[in-house]
């Protein structure tokens, strides 16, 4: 039997992530915002500060951060119905992932009795929307915290880790970093790796798609993912110093 034709990458090798760019301060109504591009995938992230504590955080010494995720109807090749079901399984799973990832980066004690909402909306989807949302959410939080510091509303920088994310997968027997949509469709295993820019692991999500893989293959995916997050953050972090919107 002839093996299936694997997607060919244009302009990058198997271990090179797609170019990442970000613009801060793109929403004049939000106290923190960012528009992030990762290849053809685009995410708009905004931060809102609510003066109400999350129910489970009442009386605690720190605030809470929660995330929401949504895809525009024409973010994909074919129009999909606008999301109205708050119990959508995939959406709920991604929102929990985003919340955990972004909370790991923040000292929330300055936000006692308050709740931070990070909204991530997919404008264009070409694979990796959840990892791009982690990056966009982190950029929007950076924008938010920078504005609070500059306005005197905060005295100490509350972001304790620069957190990023990347997808890694096995396409045939080849390990590839930052899968686009065509690669994601045929991957026999893929992981979403969330880590800090110093190489500390935050979360791993994913597994085998087309049958079991070996422990060695999983370990290689994980190690490559953590290293690739550091590569992406080296490209992204300097851009966070520039406010290009408001």
Swiss-Prot record:
Domain of life the protein comes from: Bacteria
Residues reported in the UniProt entry to bind phosphate: 90, 128-130
CDD domains referenced in this protein's UniProt entry, alphabetically: RNase_PH_bact (cd11362)
Region (Disordered): 1-33
GO MF term set: 3'-5'-RNA exonuclease activity; RNA binding; tRNA binding; tRNA nucleotidyltransferase activity
Enzyme's top EC category: transferase
InterPro entries xrefs: ExoRNase_PH_dom1, ExoRNase_PH_dom2, ExoRNase_PH_dom2_sf, PNPase/RNase_PH_dom_sf, Ribosomal_Su5_D2-typ_SF, RNase_PH, RNase_PH_bac-type, RNase_PH_CS
EC number: 2.7.7.56
Catalytic activity reported: tRNA(n+1) + phosphate = tRNA(n) + a ribonucleoside 5'-diphosphate
Keyword Transmembrane helix in record: no
Assigned keywords, A-Z: Nucleotidyltransferase, RNA-binding, rRNA processing, Transferase, tRNA processing, tRNA-binding
UniProt GO BP: rRNA catabolic process; rRNA processing; tRNA processing
Record-linked NCBIfam families: RNasePH
Role this protein plays: Phosphorolytic 3'-5' exoribonuclease that plays an important role in tRNA 3'-end maturation. Removes nucleotide residues following the 3'-CCA terminus of tRNAs; can also add nucleotides to the ends of RNA molecules by using nucleoside diphosphates as substrates, but this may not be physiologically important. Probably plays a role in initiation of 16S rRNA degradation (leading to ribosome degradation) during starvation.
Subunit structure: Homohexameric ring arranged as a trimer of dimers.
Record family assignment: Belongs to the RNase PH family.
Protein's name in the database: Ribonuclease PH
Phylogenetic placement of the source organism: Bacteria, Thermotogati, Deinococcota, Deinococci, Deinococcales
